[in-house]
Amino acid sequence: MPEIKLTHVTKRWGKFYAVDDLSLDMEDNSFITLLGPSGCGKTTTLRMIAGLETPTSGQIKIGDRVVFDSEAGINVPANKRKVGFLFQNYALWPNMTVYQNISFGLGNIKEELPVIDEEAKALKSMIKALENPGELVKLIEECRDKKGKLDLDMVYLKLIDNYTISIYTAKELYNYKLHEAADKESTSKQKKQELTAKLDSILAGHKEKREELNEKFEVVSGGKVVTRVRKYSKEEIDLAVRRVSRIVKIGMFMNRYPAELSGGQQQRVAIARTLAPEP
């Protein structure tokens, strides 16, 4: 989270001052605890930062951006502030799986975003995985149960976590059936050559348009990253969900419902959902 700065922030309901002339600096990447008795304004302050409550007066700045200024008439809505807010009761949707709870908000975001060549990004990830066929096969074989049957959910999770890829790329990588090949080295080499040729063709296509891809696989034209107003793709949403699930260690619970989780596990899901927008 970038630096957050509150300057002379006041929140008043009638004659009651929930927050009175508060000035506060929160440094970039710092961990801040607001300590005080019930009713002193802790939650109100957090809600004002997130945009869920409108201050009576003052200024709130997140990073280099002023998100509220009473004198200038600025009040950026909550969904444009990129601030995660973890409610005290977790507020998980009981009818949604863990995956759906985390991804739900991401699917509603629509803003100016870089144009990304997702196919090229996935191809590069698979090529990298195929550079070490022994490691790839080992990861898959580790997912057999006592009867020798592969647990596909575990296979996908291992591939996702080890290669930092989406579920879609993990499934495609598994479907190459490298673990079943008689000559794994030759099969891996052949598949790698096919994918490399496909990637080269994509890069050549960008070159014809006088474009290139940067290290994030964002399309660059004229030295600038190309952007457009759009929603996150399924690939981007899945990568975001997998990223935060690794942080809080809930990757194995993606298909479960909140009622099937312990209180601590539900808390992790709520934290993951808060982190997913990547403020």
Cite the ranges covered by each PLM segment:
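Short coil-to-helix segment of the ABC ATPase nucleotide-binding domain corresponding to the Q-loop/switch region
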Residues: 96-105, 109-117, 121, 218
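ABC ATPase NBD coupling module
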Residues: 67-84, 108, 115-117, 127, ...
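The feature captures the beta-strand-to-loop junction immediately N-terminal to the Walker
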Residues: 35-37
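Conserved signature/switch motifs of ABC ATPase nucleotide-binding domains
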Residues: 256, 277
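Conserved ABC ATPase signature
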Residues: 257-261, 265
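Hydrophobic anchor residue at the start of the ABC signature
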Residues: 271
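Helix-to-loop junction immediately C-terminal to a conserved catalytic motif
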Residues: 50
